[in-house]
Amino acid sequence: MDFGFTDDQREIQRTARDLLAGRATPARVREHAEARTIDAPLWHELSELGWAGIAVAEQYGGQGLGQIELSILCEELGRALAPVPFLPSAMAATVIEHGGSPALCERWLPGLASGESIGALGAAVDGAAELVIGAPDAQVIVLVEGDGSARVLAAEEAELTPIESIDPTRSAASVSAAGAGEELPDGCAGLGRALVSVSSELVGVCDRALSMTVDYVKDRKQFGVPVGSFQAVSHRCAQMLLETEQARSTAAFAAWTADADPERLAEAAAMAKAAASDAGREVTAAAIQMHGGIGFTWEADVHWLFKRGQLDAALLGGAGRHRARIAAILADRAGAPALG
C-alpha cells in the first residue's frame, strides 16, 4: 500500500488546481452562489476535459480511471468551491456503474460520462429524500435507502420540490420516487465509493479553510503583534490541522481500498466519512471564529467554506451514523451482537 501519488495522478492534481485557480475564483463563486446557478461554461469545460467521466468505464465513454483519480478531482473542486454539479453527478454515476444492470449502465452512463447529462444522489426513506443536492439540474436521480437498496429514475419521473439549502453554491430539492424508476440489483456496491467522494471533497474544503485562517492570523495584528502568535490561536490552528489531516488520511485509505481491496471498502468508507464529517463541521466553524468579527460578514469568503462543510458533513449520513456502521461491521466480524 502506497499513499504517494503516481506521476499521472500528481499531474491530474496540478492541472486541476491550476485550472480552478483561474476559473473558479472567489468572485466567480460568489456570483453564482448569490444567483444560485451552476457555472455552465465551467461545467462544459470540465466535461470537455473528461472530468465528468474520469472514473466511468471506457466502454461507457469514460476515462476508465479509479477512485483515487476521482477523489483527487473531488478534493480540488471542494477546495475551489466550484459551482458545478461534479460531486452529485459523479456519485450517481458510481452507484449506477457498480450496482446497476448492463441495461441501466448503457442508458445512463454515456451521458453522465460526457457531462451532457447530470446526475444526483440522495439518501431516502421509503422512496423519499428530504435533500438531494443537484436534483433541480439533474436528468437522472439515484435514491439510496438505509438498507442499501437503491432506485434509479429519470428526473421527470420524480416528484421534485426545489429547496434552498445552507450552501447556495448548489441547487437542491426534496425528491419522491413515488414508485417510479428501476431498482438497482446491488445498491450497496457503489455507495462506498460515493462516500469516499464526498469525504474527499470535505478534505479540500477543510484544507482551504485552514489555509485561509492561517494566512489571516499571520496578518491580523492586535497589541502590536500577529494574533497567530497567541497560544490560544496557534493551538486552535494546530487542532484544525490535526482534524484536516485525519480526514485526509482516512479518505486516502478509503480511495485506495476502493481500487485495491474493495471487500474492505464498506468499513474504510465509513471511517472516512465519519472523520471527514467531524472535520467539515469543526474546521470550518473554527475558521469563522478565528477570523473574528469579519468572519461573520457576507463579504468574507470564509463563510462559503463553512456552508459547504456543514452541508457535506450531513450528506449520506453524518459522523454518528457512520461510527454506528463501523461498530456493526466490527461486531459482525467478531461474531458479537451490534449495539443499538
Predicted feature locations:
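Alpha-helical interface subdomain recognition
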Residues: 1-80, 115, 192-340
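A short linear-motif detector with a strong N-terminal bias
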Residues: 31-33, 74-75, 97-101, 121-123, ...
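Short, flexible active-site-proximal loops enriched in glycine and acidic residues
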Residues: 80-88
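FAD-binding core of flavoproteins
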Residues: 82, 94, 102-215, 225, ...
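Helix-loop "lid/cap" segments that line or gate small-molecule binding pockets
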Residues: 91-100, 328
